[in-house]
Amino acid sequence: MHTLRGAPALSDFRLAKLLAQCRERVPSVSSIYAEFVHLIDAPAPLSEADLATLGRLLDYGPRVATGARIGSLLLVLPRPGTISPWSSKATDIVHNCGLGERVRRMERGTAFFIAGPDGQALQDAELERLKPVLHDRMTQAVVGRLEDAAILFAGHTPRPFTTVDVLGGGRAALVTANRELGLALADDEMDYLVARFTELKRNPTDVELMMFAQANSEHCRHKIFNASWTIDGKPQERSLFQAIKNTYVQHKEGVLGAYKDNAAVIEGFEVDRFFPSPESGEWGSVREPAHIMIKVETHNHPTAISPYPGAATGAGGEIRDEGATGRGARPKAGLTGFSVSHLRIPGFEQPWEQPYGKPDRIVSALDIMVDGPLGGAAFNNEFGRPNLTGYFRSYEVQVPTPGGVEVRGYHKPIMIAGGLGNIRASHVQKGRLQPGDKLIVLGGPAMLIGLGGGAASSMAQGASAADLDFASVQRDNAEMERRCQEVIDSCWALGDKNPIRSIHDVGAGGLSNAVPELAHDNDLGGRLELRAVPNAEPGMSPVEIWCNEAQERYVLGVAPEDLARFAALCERERAPFSVLGDATAEQTLKLGDTQFGNAPIDLPMDVLFGKPPRMHRDVTSRPVSFAPLTLDGSLALLAERVLSHPTVADKSFLITIGDRTVSGLSSRDQMVGPWQVPVADCAVTLSTVTSTTGEAMAMGERTPLALIDAAASARMAVGEALTNIAAARIGKLSDVKLSANWMAAAGSPGEDASLYAAVHAVGMELCPALGLTIPVGKDSMSMRTVWEEGGARKAVTSPVSLIISAFAPVLDVRKSLTPQLVDVADDTRLLFIDLARGKQRLGGSVVAHVHGQVGPESPDVEDPALLRGFFAAVQALSESGSLLAYHDRSDGGLWATLCEMAFAGRCGLDVDLAPLGGDVTAALFNEELGAVVQVRASDVARVREVLAQHGLSRDVHELGRPVTALQVRVRHGGDTLMAEDTLALRRTWSRVSYEMQKLRDNPICADQESAARSDASDPGLSPKLTFDPAQDVAAPFIAKGARPRVAVLREQGVNSQQEMAAAFTRAGFAAVDVHMSDILSGRVSLEGFKGVLACGGFSYGDVLGAGGGWAKSILFNPRARDAFAAFFARPDSFGLGVCNGCQMMSQLKDIIPGAEHFPRFVRNASEQYEARLSLVEVSKTPSLFYQGMEGSRMLIVTSHGEGRAEFPSVEDAARVNGLGLVTTRWVDNHGRVAESYPANPNGSPHGIAGLTTRDGRFTITMPHPERVHRSVQHSWRPREWGDDGPWMRMFRNARVWLG
């Protein structure tokens, strides 16, 4: 083993945070320093030349001063016996650089040097206390000496399976195994298994039992939703699932697939779908329907235990569900949601956040909201899927019950991951597998993670042993999932020649659930080989190999004659796959093990999928009554508390961490207006890169209401989703389809009956009355946390919780409505549309919660016809252009609605509550359904007329108008009730986000952003163009018919090729998909291309620094280096590197003529991924891309984590800044070069955002012009822009340069 020192692993502010955590455990710690250590496993000693090459390969990250290596050493390593995702990618890079025969494997550890007083070493007991804050025990281990790291490369002996002696020990033996293995088997299931194995005259193996437990867990089989019911002694006619399916029975139109696949499919529009030709690789359009898959998952249990990987794998699993729909599909855009208990932010604890405690086995609500959103966002970012909408609720309350005071809340959180994608019409239905078809696993290796996750998530939190809880959390590798998705995309692009007959994602239960499901769906069995499963941990037992939930895997069936084609696609994408065996006509599952010459599984399929007795729920309802609300304090104090409640407050800290523009198909994200305020009601995507049609999605949830009335809570969730999605231009209400995610603490007093009432209200009554279908959903029935503390038994039980996600095809993305108040200086009016017919019930509201109360009466949807008429009226008014702004009423009531509209429009309000009655508190803070619209004064009569035509004549109230003065004034007739400064209210509303950013990110950046929000003179994003974007300067050249070829270059993990190809295709080029494997293998030569376009993404998952692995696989591979050097030297060639491509090209400066001044790009100053709509100014340079654009200030997309330009010295940065080769600079909204955050999103000196070579042929840029080459791709833009975005000029300039 060789070791090479790496760079410091943590920045100063991260070290300071870690030091504080360490001192909480060991007060005598005086200092801590961390640096990376690289560990190289080589078959023979490496030469000096090899070590020098490795040294250059491993030179990555910011160049900062190293700290003192004093005190005690704790070396954190990947867990011995495992191969980390870092290792597999770094080893790939090393092998691609020509060291494959000399380096077997590389791993990376982190060396922590921790000192006591005077730099002394710590005691062993003290070091033990520090280990939990330094490592993740699921995936890492800690050693005390560098030489102990050799254990990483030691061989591990595989272990055999075990059996459970059912024949000798009977049921008692199975009861013991159930407890020890965490199988979560019910009594009737154990009886069933004893009977079946007695019939078979043999004992079950641990593999067979775990497989049965996973396949038949509540998580996988939804036993409660399929159960029969008796409530209060009265048998019920339907199961819960039958009530949901009733919506489909009543309204099938527009639904192409429901209930039987990984996602539902609904009808989309016929459009020009854009993807590379399977034959030529050239990107082009195919006219066909782009049907829409929709799916929403939960990942609650893992997120409670370990939030970052829990949320990350939640997002990853849902993405795989979409990709594995039908015969393969493409995910497009995501949504996310979190419900947690009190945040209790240190230094910002709120009066209503009374402490109650939590069990040690789960993390706090605060930790969930610090780490969980980062995990979900990071997975989406790296995979390459924009996350465009979501919700966040913080709720915990003590309530009186007949049995005493109970705590209701979300110690077991809700973590929602959902989204939509597109699928070809011919691939909506899965094909039938035939005997002899190959059963294949595609994706990463088996790892000992997530064992028993399906069973574990089916138990109440705390009902299983802590080690089993922790073992059931999976770990993520988004870059691997991206490679698999590229294979799936290549397969569906083949149309009728798609080699995939059927595909499932590998989720709960791992292969033990996915493989039998694939065979069983086709009435087949399978003969399989255990050792064919790719395995990163050779020491695992058969049960661990077969049942682990290692992520980023799919199982699929391929005909033998299509195997070679499928293998070639996998090889090109470097996506691992393995043939596990064959499908068989005999319906038996036989899993052989060549290692031990036995069969861990040999089971008739009907044992696994037989029908254990159907569950019956015999439950009683529990009547509740809550005292009338007593709301203390002035109206101004109530208003402040409501705005600062996390459920109402600014969600920026959850949004700017997530890429919202990757793929170039986002049209409406969360951020609204020139001040980019996160208040959008819904998300809107484009059907394809050239369309104005699209898809919308929105969410609705009103879970606190369920404490009062579960049925009303469910109806309100549907209602909120509809008032949100109404902001998109949708044909008719029945075009909207819903996903329903149901959470309940089944078995807790009264909760089962409440769940039944909620499902019945939506499935049997409201949705049929509205013409709505629920073709997809999920249930999680163990929403209770139990523990002991100080000898007392404690519990936190969630309310019955319905999260609705609404999806619909969109007729015209340009007509999406937002809450931004516009034309404030003109005569406009605010109309309030009240869908509660004057009722102002405050039960379950935020204003009740800030008083620690619930309230006796819940808002409700009492007249579905009113909601139907409202939706139709809003669509008619949207089509006619009569609505200037729109925002629904929800959490925080009318007060939050009005404030958010004022924040988005950066204006004041003059509001009169007199039309709403005399109870101003109820009028302002009730959360009944409704919406506020802004209309021109001259249009008020016509708008009222349209609303009246739809049955809303008595539900419209004129409340006042927006004003230019930055003051929100609330009156009741002539009495002023409140007059608050808009910016002061905005600071109150944004305080939670500021405090969370300060805790999580670089606090200096959080302070700078907070200060920027308070700038009263901020004009908002202010683009200024020196050219006409409507002028097509390339038209004369395109008219000649020549389409120069450009290579749209990608490496494994790159995800932004579609938008790059779209921009250059629109500019008259022939854009060709080129993978680095094509070049390294010699399949493709760069000689036939005029341009090389290096795309954005996460090549090699940013291992060895962003773009570093990609660059080094060129520099250190002779064939690739020669090819690129020759291309760069040609005078007729040009190149563009964007984001990851920019990071990569900057490291090729030694072989790019005139690029010696290129910097390297390192971690953003915020130490966070930054996704924003920014401003840059174009400078005068030789760059061929920017000719005629000089002096323009332009809107551009920022999406990167490592975009800070780093030069060898301050002097070097100043020198490069003066060379006339900086193409673009970040500027603030006043047009000044931006040095502070967030106008300068990464901290680059002199605002440097892009550079070019001395002759202008090669340009690099961190922000993404290709993602906003059309105006509809901007989250905000001036209304006068046409279809071409200003950045389209840049791509046309390249066509002009070629002539």
From Swiss-Prot:
Q: Name one Pfam family in it.
A: GATase_5
InterPro entries referenced in this protein's UniProt entry, alphabetically: Class_I_gatase-like (IPR029062), FGAR-AT_N (IPR040707), FGAR-AT_PurM_N-like (IPR055181), PurL_large (IPR010073), PurL_linker (IPR041609), PurM-like_C_dom (IPR010918), PurM-like_C_sf (IPR036676), PurM-like_N_sf (IPR036921)
Q: Which reaction does it catalyse?
A: N(2)-formyl-N(1)-(5-phospho-beta-D-ribosyl)glycinamide + L-glutamine + ATP + H2O = 2-formamido-N(1)-(5-O-phospho-beta-D-ribosyl)acetamidine + L-glutamate + ADP + phosphate + H(+)
Enzyme class, broadest EC rank:
ligase
Question: Which GO biological-process labels does this protein carry?
Answer: 'de novo' IMP biosynthetic process
- Annotated Gene Ontology cellular component terms: cytoplasm
Cite the binding residues for ATP: 310-321, 389-391, 680, 890
For this UniProt record, give its keywords in alphabetical order, as a comma-separated list: ATP-binding, Cytoplasm, Glutamine amidotransferase, Ligase, Magnesium, Metal-binding, Nucleotide-binding, Purine biosynthesis
UniProt-annotated catalytic positions: C1139, H1264, E1266
For the ligand (Mg(2+)), the binding residues are D681, E720, N724, D888
Any one Gene Ontology molecular-function term assigned to this protein's record: metal ion binding
What pathway is this protein said to act in by its record? Purine metabolism; IMP biosynthesis via de novo pathway; 5-amino-1-(5-phospho-D-ribosyl)imidazole from N(2)-formyl-N(1)-(5-phospho-D-ribosyl)glycinamide: step 1/2
Main localization of the protein described in the UniProt heading:
cytoplasm
Q: Does the keyword RNA-binding apply?
A: no
> In what residue span(s) does the Glutamine amidotransferase type-1 domain sit?
1046-1299
Q: What is its EC number?
A: 6.3.5.3
Q: Where in the cell is it found?
A: Cytoplasm
User: Which purpose does this protein serve, as stated in its record?
Assistant: Phosphoribosylformylglycinamidine synthase involved in the purines biosynthetic pathway. Catalyzes the ATP-dependent conversion of formylglycinamide ribonucleotide (FGAR) and glutamine to yield formylglycinamidine ribonucleotide (FGAM) and glutamate.
Q: Which family does the entry's similarity section mention?
A: In the N-terminal section; belongs to the FGAMS family.
Oligomeric and partner information: Monomer.
| Protein name stated in the entry | Phosphoribosylformylglycinamidine synthase
> Native species of this protein?
Myxococcus xanthus (strain DK1622)
